């Protein structure tokens, strides 16, 4: 919802980047037709293991550089909790789940592709500290890293990509300090507390720099205190 002339999307997972590039650059109708065709050919159904394993094998036995992002999207739709998981060889290794493609998801896909095509977006898969050539004082930076004190398929270090740990957390926080000193406005999504565990690194960093904290719905929920951290006066942008 941020009004801007250009969007820059950076994700360490280059497979996610390729998927978004596909949504932007390929014809939306052709994407939809591909999904419908593959569902019919392989008789995909939510919770049914055998057809799912066939398309997963098709994806994994294709050379990495030739793997179709649309097939990855199909795997995500029918995979467990719709997660994006890879092993160290970049083979997709998520088991079958209980979800699938339906009319509601089709509407969301079409709407998302249309919106993406209307925007001026550039896609990257760089380390977050290597973005300086794309950032200036007029840039607004939003960071949504893995949450240090929660466990996800993206931050256990076993999914074919770099895991998230205290070292990475410190690197990110130091980089945001660097942006702040340059006068660049940023927003960071994170979690202060989860199941009685606190992210003391983040708490100390916020207090040291005097950054603003916004809680989702103004309160903690389900033993999980999700927050947004900003380095500017929120009232200026309301």
Model-derived features: positions:
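Conserved S-adenosyl-L-methionine
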Residues: 1-41
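Class I S-adenosyl-L-methionine
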Residues: 1-8, 12, 129-135, 139, ...
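Short active-site-adjacent helix-start/loop capping segments
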Residues: 16-19, 82, 196
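Alpha-helix boundary recognition
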Residues: 21, 74, 116-117, 177, ...
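SAM-dependent nucleic-acid methyltransferase catalytic core
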Residues: 25-142, 146-157, 171
């Amino acid at each position: 919802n941020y009004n801007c002339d250009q969007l820059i999307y950076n994700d360490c997972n280059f497979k996610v980047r390729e998927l978004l590039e596909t949504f932007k650059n390929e014809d939306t109708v052709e994407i939809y037709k591909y999904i419908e065709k593959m569902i019919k050919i392989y008789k995909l159904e939510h919770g049914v293991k055998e057809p799912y394993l066939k398309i997963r094998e098709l994806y994994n036995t294709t050379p990495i550089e030739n793997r179709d992002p649309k097939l990855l999207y199909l795997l995500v739709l029918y995979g467990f909790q719709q997660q994006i998981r890879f092993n160290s060889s970049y083979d997709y290794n998520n088991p079958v789940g209980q979800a699938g493609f339906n009319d509601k998801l089709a509407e969301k896909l079409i709407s998302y592709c249309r919106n993406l095509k209307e925007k001026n977006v550039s896609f990257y898969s760089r380390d977050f500290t290597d973005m300086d050539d794309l950032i200036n004082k007029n840039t607004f930076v939003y960071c949504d890293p893995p949450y240090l004190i929660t466990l996800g398929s993206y931050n256990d270090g076993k999914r074919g990509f770099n895991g998230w740990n205290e070292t990475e957390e410190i690197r990110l926080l130091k980089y945001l300090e660097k942006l702040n000193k340059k006068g660049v406005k940023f927003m960071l999504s994170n979690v202060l507390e989860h199941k009685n565990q606190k992210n003391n690194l983040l708490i100390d960093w916020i207090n040291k720099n005097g950054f603003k904290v916004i809680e989702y719905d103004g309160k903690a929920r389900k033993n999980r205190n999700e927050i947004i951290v900003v380095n500017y006066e929120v009232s200026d942008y309301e």
